[in-house]
Amino acid sequence: MNIFGTDGVRGRANVYPMDPITVLRLGMAIGLEARKVGTQVVLGKDTRISGYMVESALVSGLVAMGVNVGLLGPMPTAAIATLVRNLRASMGVVISASHNSYLDNGVKIFDSEGIKIPLELEEVLESNVRAELSSDLAQVRGMGKVYRIAGAVGRYIEFVKGTFPKRLKLSGMKIVVDCANGAAYHIGGEVFWELGADVVVIGNKPDGLNINHNCGSLHPEGMVQKVLEEGADIGIALDGDADRVVVCDEKGRLVDGDQVIASIMRHLRATKSITDAAVTTMSSKSIDSYARELGVRLHRSEVGDRHLVDTMRRHSCSVGGEKSGHIILWEHSTTSDSLVAALQILSIMLLENKSASSIFGDFVPMPRVHRDIPYSMEFDHIARLIGPTLSDVEQALGRVNGRVIFRRSGTERLIRCVIEGEDPKLVALVADELSIKLRELGVENGVEPEMQ
């Protein structure tokens, strides 16, 4: 069974592959590769309770291979990608399961340039996790040391603020920030406050168990309510490792990643500073025509931050993102950074002198239903059983410029099912019929239906 998915290693904490023995061996495998480049690895994490175990196991493996480890503590994923470059480290490692609950944990790995490691290196690491590495252990004199990196939070805050136009301030703007009780709990509000905003922070009291629990980008209802209560100009919800952002406007209407990307594309195109952008297969079909109208070449990648970055690099894209809220601004970041993306949105509001609802109102996503379906039987077996029904669905949706996406998640045991088309009634009808068929086949019903 492969331990790497679409975004590093992820699974239930204390269960393979996130058990201490496997994580220790992963640390050794990472150390074996890192020492080919240098002697330092930086290591950050989010706030889930299992992070202590995972951190200890990884550190043991790394120092045993002769690698020094700089501990960052709770920090956003993008902060590690930034600091690995600034500190000239061999690799950066993040302990996080992103938007998953506290029950899970994971490991993401960045190279010395702050880019997620390629598939080929993942395969090497996977092989070495299973290999006998005792002969590769460092001599006692050459074992690594562990130290805490002082001032890392301040460094990252200054980096994020540096992506905001120097002539602008957030004075007079009221912002609600939901930090998801995650890695940005001590950073999210500080960034906007230091730039002059009146900030209302929620989801900033992590206890190791409440990360992403009824808060953050997956559960933005609290943010929406707080925006309406406070009369705020905008709401910004992060996830557990602050690599995705979900926004609501001053009217409490939610804005997804596609709308954020569309707004950024429109603004950058008006300044002639963008020719190419990238999204994944999960993005709305209507964003393609929107980009064409702007004169922007839009490229699509497979789902996942690494695939998106590969596409952006190949086509020299200025901006890229996923509907889920991962936004990459290549001028500033090598991975998705929710705080940098949020400042980009705020700068557009100020430069165009418009409200949040105005800057997002230009792009209308195609009607869709998105269902996350838990499953227990083998996915390939499910795909074979549901195949004829999917063919019928695709044929029906073809009449309304629609499509169906039926794929397994690379980070959770869920099937991602998306039905979209220009006729919302047909989309809803097809989604219901597909759900009925899945129940008949013994697959569990979808959870958290979303109609846009």
Swiss-Prot record:
It comes from the Bacteria. GO terms for molecular function: magnesium ion binding; phosphoglucosamine mutase activity; phosphomannomutase activity. Pfam families: PGM_PMM_I (PF02878), PGM_PMM_II (PF02879), PGM_PMM_III (PF02880), PGM_PMM_IV (PF00408). Keywords: Isomerase, Magnesium, Metal-binding, Phosphoprotein. It is an enzyme of class 5 (isomerase). Activated by phosphorylation. InterPro entries: A-D-PHexomutase_a/b/a-I (IPR005844), A-D-PHexomutase_a/b/a-I/II/III (IPR016055), A-D-PHexomutase_a/b/a-II (IPR005845), A-D-PHexomutase_a/b/a-III (IPR005846), A-D-PHexomutase_C (IPR005843), A-D-PHexomutase_C_sf (IPR036900), Alpha-D-phosphohexomutase_SF (IPR005841), GlmM_bact (IPR006352). The modification Phosphoserine is found at residue 98. Binds 1 Mg(2+) ion per subunit. GO terms for cellular component: cytosol. Belongs to the phosphohexose mutase family. This is Phosphoglucosamine mutase.
